[in-house]
Amino acid sequence: MNIAKHLLFLSAGALLPAAAQDAAAEKLAALQSGVTAAQTSGDNAWMLVSTALVLLMTGPGLALFYGGLVRKKNILGTLMQSFIMMALATILWAVVGYSLAFGEGSAFLGDLRYFMLKGVGGDPNGDYAATIPHQTFMLFQMMFAIITPALIT
């Protein structure tokens, strides 16, 4: 009888660490998902701030810089060149540019997988940026598609 009590006590004690490990594993999983969510939102916020900074560098920054390089009578024309280039590059990027740059195709030219931004949503794209939404990645890349021809004008 005494041995049976000890076996019962030992078997109950053996179950306690397993239950504690399960609870600890659940807490650890919850903490990891919280850290991942915080990291993802932080990454997204930084990418959006960076996108806005590049847009400001193109819009008022580059337009005013070029406006200061010309004579007084040509300032508006020079400013409008920069702003029209921004509008045109945005439309072209949304229609075909992103798809040709980042679609799956050859090593030099993508396919029309993302034509008119079809399939570009809020979920991360594991091929390019695993912690930010696909839309944020597309916007960030679009800013450089905007500023590149604006630098040439």
Question: What residue ranges belong to the model's regions?
Answer:
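Hydrophobic alpha-helical transmembrane bundles of multi-pass membrane proteins
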Residues: 2-153
